Amino acid sequence: MLGLLAKITTISFPGLGIGEFEVNKIAVSADKLAFLKKIFGENWGGIAWYGVIIMIGIVLAALYGMSRAKIEGISSDDILDVILVAVIVSVIGARVYYVVFYGGYDSLYDLVAVWNGGLAIYGAVIGGIISLIIMSKIKKVPALRLLDIGASSIILGQAIGRWGNFVNAEAYGYETTLPWRMGIGSGANAIFVHPTFLYESLWNIVGFVLIWSLYKKKKYDGQMFFIYLAWYGFGRMLIEGLRTDSLWLVPYVIRVSQLIGAVCFVICTAILVLMEIKQRKAAKNGCNN
């Protein structure tokens, strides 16, 4: 990954006919919000687009989750409580996962400044699953039903959130000459890489549409959750192989995210197949009776 510290990055997609343009990482500069420096400290650079985009993803995912919960017969008050807890725990989980595996922070401010980047989706998923299971017990709602709602919501949030990586000039892939290559830098200093953030965003959009279309045909609680993990795991396993900022489990053999993705894909696909067989046997026995 290209570790760019500048607030403005020059981007291009020459193979698609899109010339060089500048992307500013800061949505609102600290100079315009000087009073907030008393809260966040002198090192605070302003409101970053990364944080804005992540927040948009969270809000849209929450709104979709609330609409889906209504269809599932879960009260608005209950699902709102669930969402608030899930969002907080997911963000904490995403940050903890990132800090544990990547580290490199010199101050408490840098450690908690999630608005500047540094969130790991697997940490968010783990935190979200744990919070949903706990809240299902508190609200007396089937855990797998909540996980179905959460899965269909989080994949939408992921699709949007990946664009935070775009403005932060991070999570890119190896250099390539493919027509859809993305240029980073200007003129002779530019390098052309796989836009892996875009690959994952598009993959998640397709996954969201798939889950949305299958939801009305859902046969049992947990089905959408397992489809989500299988779909995302498979896509992440492939896309991660193109990234240059991965955490290696075995150097130059397999990455941590690839292994997690592969495990999710294999286990959840097996569960889906076994449940389908079980459903068909039950239907056949019902017809015979």
Question: What are the residue ranges of the model-derived segments?
Answer:
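A feature for loop-to-transmembrane-helix boundaries and adjacent hydrophobic helices
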Residues: 1-289
